[in-house]
Amino acid sequence: MLKYEERKLNNLTLSSFSKVGVSNDARLYIAKENTDKAYVAPEKFSSKVLTWLGKMPLFKNTEVVQKHTENIRVQDQKILQTFLHALTEKYGETAVNDALLMSRINMNKPLTQRLAVQITECVKAADEGFINLIKSKDNVGVRNAALVIKGGDTKVAEKNNDVGAESKQPLLDIALKGLKRTLPQLEQMDGNSLRENFQEMASGNGPLRSLMTNLQNLNKIPEAKQLNDYVTTLTNIQVGVARFSQWGTCGGEVERWVDKASTHELTQAVKKIHVIAKELKNVTAELEKIEAGAPMPQTMSGPTLGLARFAVSSIPINQQTQVKLSDGMPVPVNTLTFDGKPVALAGSYPKNTPDALEAHMKMLLEKECSCLVVLTSEDQMQAKQLPPYFRGSYTFGEVHTNSQKVSSASQGEAIDQYNMQLSCGEKRYTIPVLHVKNWPDHQPLPSTDQLEYLADRVKNSNQNGAPGRSSSDKHLPMIHCLGGVGRTGTMAAALVLKDNPHSNLEQVRADFRDSRNNRMLEDASQFVQLKAMQAQLLMTTAS
């Protein structure tokens, strides 16, 4: 539901910005006659005087002038957003986006009737297919051209692919407004409405078409890389027959699939779209912060889609190293690296929901993990009511498991080993499981010898070579405790030491934090035990 203030502004049409008898170069702003009406008006004389005083060194730092300058900035931003909204209502988001991208008009200037006409002419040209003409294969020589308005004529000029600074904020504003409008519509969609209204939803200003158009804006702004990476992950998720990014176009394979899909298939597709739409609200929140003056985010946790046990505010997930399934679905797991080489997969204890456990099992199966290492103690599993998913037989969605206990290892029977058979469709895989039952949270193992012994067991379970020799996220050990930062980081670091006892532990910790989050190897006592293990290994090597 739009706020009352937004509804008033959105009622302003393009004709509202054409003022008879007003100079074409007069600055325009949105005035309020009373609480029920907003209208476009030329700048008042008193405002012009204060603006002029702001250019004088003697007056520009006075409180009244500084306050006026800030008010002008807010007014200019508001009227530009309102004007672009009016343009979008008439010509559509695609035309407005293309015009902003290709135009060399300075959007940082105050809006005047002259500027409004120039922008409108650009949008008209885009709406009539001029941008498509420039980009077409028959016009290779002008594919990097830009629209330039001079003397009322539309011309073509050479331009690189970078978006000008003056266009970035308008593009972000359009993206924000589009997300606010389309996400609630997608969340209310069901299978029946998807089948009945797909053509309308995937064309024009329909929510699916509009969503994809607005998300593309982020790809045009280099500084928005974190947001764009987040969006790309979500739009690469398979929904039905195709990646979600393909759902904004009608007349293709998605439309044919929607027309023939079963009720169950449509229900599953809508369920995924709902989850994606909910996740995209994080992008909306970031854009709102930027609109309020915050800088572009330099880091951003990857999307969790409800699969993570802990909120990313507690256990962040580096989206650059986040593991993804073959259907594009991201899971709350990272690839830990040291010196640029993968060491292990690391995550929290799987969330006790069918979707989370299914995704976890699919990951073990698809990535053909060399082994699964569960560092959560038996006492903690019982206290936290954590699902013992790695022993026994279960069905998690499409994945079936059958785990048989092989042995209780030495070290005081503190380590149980299982062989867990996984099957999903025609794919089968058996993964060794090591469950360490006596490692308390935030504490070291009872002895350094046990840590070294455990590292040997993990390495011996790895039939694909020592950790760190893989060049991808496949064939690596999957390690988790409860949160996936302390014991998990310690175990992975121990594997690095077994591979090379001379490794710099401080650098290992730094690389793990870059790989996953700043909490990796956060417990001092566990780090001390790693140093003790390193000393033992170096002594053995020396002798």
Swiss-Prot record:
How does its record describe regulation of its activity? Answer: The tyrosine phosphatase activity is inhibited by sodium vanadate.
The GO terms describing molecular function are: GTPase activator activity; protein tyrosine phosphatase activity
Q: Where is this region: Chaperone-binding?
A: 35-139
Q: Which cellular compartments is it found in?
A: Secreted; Host cytoplasm
The record's EC number reads: 3.1.3.48
Gene Ontology cellular-component annotations: extracellular space; host cell cytoplasm
Tyrosine-protein phosphatase domain: residues covered = 315-543
Residue intervals of the Bacterial Rho-GAP domain = 162-293
**Keyword set includes Secreted:** yes
Active-site residue numbers: C481
Q: Which UniProt keywords apply?
A: GTPase activation, Host cytoplasm, Hydrolase, Protein phosphatase, Secreted, Virulence
Q: Name one Pfam family in it.
A: SicP-binding
- Say where the protein is mainly found: secreted
Explain what the record says happens when changing R209A.
Loss of GAP activity
Origin: domain of life: Bacteria
Which residues are annotated as site, described as Arginine finger? R209
Q: Which PROSITE patterns match?
A: BACT_RHOGAP (PS52059), TYR_PHOSPHATASE_1 (PS00383), TYR_PHOSPHATASE_2 (PS50056), TYR_PHOSPHATASE_PTP (PS50055)
Q: What is the effect of changing Q246A?
A: Loss of RAC1 binding and GAP activity
Subunit structure comment from the entry = Forms a complex with SicP. Binds host RAC1.
What other note does the entry give for this protein?
A: Requires SicP as a chaperone for its stability and for secretion. The structure of the SptP-SicP complex contains four molecules of the chaperone SicP, aligned in a linear fashion and arranged in two sets of tightly bound homodimers that bind two SptP molecules. The SicP homodimers do not interact with each other, but are held together by a molecular interface formed between two SptP molecules. The chaperone-binding domain of SptP does not adopt a globular fold for interaction with SicP.
For this protein, the record's NCBIfam families field holds: PRK15375.1
Q: What does this protein do?
A: Effector proteins function to alter host cell physiology and promote bacterial survival in host tissues. This protein includes tyrosine phosphatase and GTPase activating protein (GAP) activities. After bacterial internalization, GAP mediates the reversal of the cytoskeletal changes induced by SopE. This function is independent of its tyrosine phosphatase activity, which remains unclear.
Q: What is this protein called?
A: Secreted effector protein SptP
Which gene is the coding source of this polypeptide chain?
Answer: sptP
